[in-house]
Amino acid sequence: MKPALLEVMRMNRICRMVLATCFGSFILVIFYFQSMLHPVMRRNPFGVDICCRKGSRSPLQELYNPIQLELSNTAILHQMRRDQVTDTCRANSAMSRKRRVLTPNDLKHLVVDEDHELIYCYVPKVACTNWKRLMMVLSGRGKYSDPMEIPANEAHVSANLKTLNQYSIPEINHRLKSYMKFLFVREPFERLVSAYRNKFTQKYNTSFHKRYGTKIIRRQRKNATQEALRKGDDVKFEEFVAYLIDPHTQREEPFNEHWQTVYSLCHPCHIHYDLVGKYETLEEDSNYVLQLAGVSGYLKFPTYAKSTRTTDEMTTEFFQNISAEHQTQLYEVYKLDFLMFNYSVPNYLKLD
């Protein structure tokens, strides 16, 4: 074959390769611009097609760098609440920062939602069942799209929620820095009475009666009957208070989470919470969190039954038979929660 013919054939092959490369590049460019104009859609747990969060504003950006220049009254209120926590921690540094370093085990109450970059510290007796339901739906962990379809007992199954202590130390630090962290609090003594009513006056809570009721009666009741010592199902509120202020109680083991202080459960002097919601403004504060997370268009905080809730009037009645000495000692136990979350000393207290 002549050299000239070979050269022509070689040039033809090169041209075909160049054309194929150009065509492939052209196709890739088309796909790229299509993906930019029409981002990948995913099915979210609410059954609504929404664009993936990547590239959108995070809850932290919505909170600290709002699009509107003037802060809303709600944003100002939450700034004041954050400042109150900070000021209390500084003023009571010796008491509030006894532990300088947190361990992963201290973070088991912090529930993580990766999709919306949220961390929620749950506090028992402060609407935590409904907030756990919401976190299950938000994170897509489970088969439910409606929070109120989730049975209460299922909301408390640990496998249904991912908590911060399950991550590595670098992953924990990254999420604490980058995610919006929030918690909900309640007037401390109202929360305490709510815990007592739920755990010690309901006959179905036999596990609490056995675990704590028998111990409280054994320590605090003189001449207790054998039946009371065996069942532990008739603990009086006065006995419960005496158990809480007994120094031996916390030396033996930490408080149960239902009556543990908020600062011990959520460590607000070590972890900077971006939002502090209150039980007294539960629906407004909850829906504000959902707004910042970008889901308020199709998800609202579930309404709750007010008929069974513990009120200030009920709390006042429960404290009528508590001596001034015991009231003072109990206030000291929960003092940081009162100060940190700006709750006044109750009028019914007879402090020494």
Swiss-Prot record:
GO cellular component, one term: Golgi membrane
Cited Pfam families: Sulfotransfer_2
InterPro entries given in the database record: Carb_sulfotrans_8-10 (IPR018011), Sulfotransferase (IPR005331)
Keyword set includes Glycoprotein: yes
Lumenal side: 38-352
Transmembrane segments: 17-37
Single Gene Ontology BP annotation: chondroitin sulfate proteoglycan metabolic process
Stretches assigned to the Cytoplasmic side: 1-16
Membrane topology note: Single-pass type II membrane protein
UniProt induction comment: By BMP2, suggesting it is a target of BMP signaling.
Catalyzed reactions: chondroitin beta-D-glucuronate + n 3'-phosphoadenylyl sulfate = chondroitin 4'-sulfate + n adenosine 3',5'-bisphosphate + n H(+)
Tissues expressing the protein: Predominantly expressed in brain and kidney. Also expressed at weaker level in heart, spleen and lung. Expressed in developing chondrocytes.
Compartment(s) of residence: Golgi apparatus membrane
Modifications made to the protein after synthesis: N-glycosylated; required for activity and stability.
GO molecular function annotation: chondroitin 4-sulfotransferase activity; dermatan 4-sulfotransferase activity; N-acetylgalactosamine 4-sulfate 6-O-sulfotransferase activity; sulfotransferase activity
Keyword vocabulary terms for this entry: Carbohydrate metabolism, Glycoprotein, Golgi apparatus, Membrane, Signal-anchor, Transferase, Transmembrane, Transmembrane helix
Residues bound to 3'-phosphoadenylyl sulfate: 124-130, 186-194
EC number of the protein: 2.8.2.5
Residues bearing carbohydrate: 205, 223, 321, 342
Similarity remark: Belongs to the sulfotransferase 2 family.
Main function: Catalyzes the transfer of sulfate to position 4 of the N-acetylgalactosamine (GalNAc) residue of chondroitin. Chondroitin sulfate constitutes the predominant proteoglycan present in cartilage and is distributed on the surfaces of many cells and extracellular matrices. Can also sulfate Gal residues in desulfated dermatan sulfate. Preferentially sulfates in GlcA->GalNAc unit than in IdoA->GalNAc unit. Does not form 4, 6-di-O-sulfated GalNAc when chondroitin sulfate C is used as an acceptor.
Protein name per UniProt: Carbohydrate sulfotransferase 11
Organism: Mus musculus (Mouse)
